[in-house]
């Protein structure tokens, strides 16, 4: 269990809702994953209520919705989308995403920090997607973000924890929850993030594009459950040198006597 803002979640797996072939498969995958916090791109929501299908579907899942500002290219656009989400969905929670580079979808650190500061002052619970930059994460924490969401690797790349060394520093230094977001392509990578000390992970592409998204969602859920249990059990310390599991001193002393 971990806490974001004032809400506790049993599952450490946050899920994205893009790239699924059907709404039904998306819903089944959310259920299989056991996710309680699900992201939703505002650009996919028909705010006029005409042919919007995804929002009613997600509301039947009984999960907390986390709208995001995906598609925003600067702070002003992100502020507009966040306020639209608050009005349309009725939540002050927002996943802040600003990535003007459409090839790599890397977050803009300057605009992200600027937008985060304004959104917090406007009463939002802000969860910013950001680069794995320890200094930036400290700044985001200082302006009042409820968590930081540093990337493991580029969005949808399935490359895993390419930023592992920097993620470790962020986990050590940051006082708010750390949710590793983007690039996680396998359950083992999600497990590794938890074993490093991350509070949760957000996964979308690896589940949505799998041959069997529902089974893959379940696989991620099991991996994170194992990681959570291992974390609470206390992982053995890593050592540079070998450490014998059974001392041989007494046995060898007996050998010397027999000679």
From Swiss-Prot:
Compartments in which it is found: Cytoplasm
Keywords: Cytoplasm, Schiff base, Thiamine biosynthesis, Transferase
A molecular function GO annotation: thiazole synthase activity
Its EC number(s): 2.8.1.10
Gene3D superfamilies per the UniProt record, alphabetical: Aldolase class I
CDD domains: ThiG
An annotated GO cellular component: cytoplasm
InterPro entries in UniProt: Aldolase_TIM, Thiazole_synthase_ThiG, ThiG
Pfam families recorded: ThiG
Binding residues annotated for 1-deoxy-D-xylulose 5-phosphate, in chain numbering: 156, 182-183, 204-205
Catalytically driven reaction(s): [ThiS sulfur-carrier protein]-C-terminal-Gly-aminoethanethioate + 2-iminoacetate + 1-deoxy-D-xylulose 5-phosphate = [ThiS sulfur-carrier protein]-C-terminal Gly-Gly + 2-[(2R,5Z)-2-carboxy-4-methylthiazol-5(2H)-ylidene]ethyl phosphate + 2 H2O + H(+)
Source superkingdom: Bacteria
Broadest EC class assigned to this enzyme: transferase
Catalytic residues of the enzyme: 95
A GO biological-process term: thiamine diphosphate biosynthetic process
Pathway the protein takes part in: Cofactor biosynthesis; thiamine diphosphate biosynthesis
Function comment: Catalyzes the rearrangement of 1-deoxy-D-xylulose 5-phosphate (DXP) to produce the thiazole phosphate moiety of thiamine. Sulfur is provided by the thiocarboxylate moiety of the carrier protein ThiS. In vitro, sulfur can be provided by H(2)S.
UniProt similarity note: Belongs to the ThiG family.
Subunit and interaction comment: Homotetramer. Forms heterodimers with either ThiH or ThiS.
Name of the molecule in the record: Thiazole synthase
Species assigned in the record: Baumannia cicadellinicola subsp. Homalodisca coagulata
């Amino acid at each position: 269990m971990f806490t974001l803002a004032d809400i506790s979640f049993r599952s450490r797996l946050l899920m994205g809702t893009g790239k699924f072939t059907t709404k039904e498969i998306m819903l089944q995958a959310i259920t299989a994953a056991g996710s309680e916090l699900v992201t939703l791109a505002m650009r996919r929501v028909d705010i006029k209520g005409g042919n919007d299908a995804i929002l009613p579907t997600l509301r039947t899942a009984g999960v907390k919705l986390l709208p995001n500002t995906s598609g925003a290219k600067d702070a002003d656009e992100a502020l507009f989308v966040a306020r639209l989400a608050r009005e349309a969905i009725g939540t002050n929670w927002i996943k802040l995403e600003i990535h003007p580079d459409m090839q790599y979808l890397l977050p803009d650190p300057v605009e992200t920090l600027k937008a985060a500061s304004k959104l917090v002052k406007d009463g939002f619970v802000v969860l910013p997607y950001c680069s794995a930059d320890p200094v930036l994460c400290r700044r985001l924490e200082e302006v009042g973000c409820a968590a930081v969401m540093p990337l493991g690797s580029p969005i949808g790349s399935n490359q895993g924890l390419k930023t592992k060394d920097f993620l470790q520093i962020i986990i050590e230094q940051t006082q708010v929850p750390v949710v590793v977001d983007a690039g996680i392509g396998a359950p083992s990578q999600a497990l590794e993030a938890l074993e490093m000390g991350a509070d949760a992970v957000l996964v979308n592409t690896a589940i949505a594009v799998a041959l069997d998204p529902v089974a893959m969602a379940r696989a991620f859920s099991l991996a994170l459950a194992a990681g959570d249990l291992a974390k609470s059990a206390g992982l053995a310390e890593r050592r540079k040198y070998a450490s014998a599991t059974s001392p041989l001193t007494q046995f060898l002393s007996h050998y010397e006597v027999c000679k």
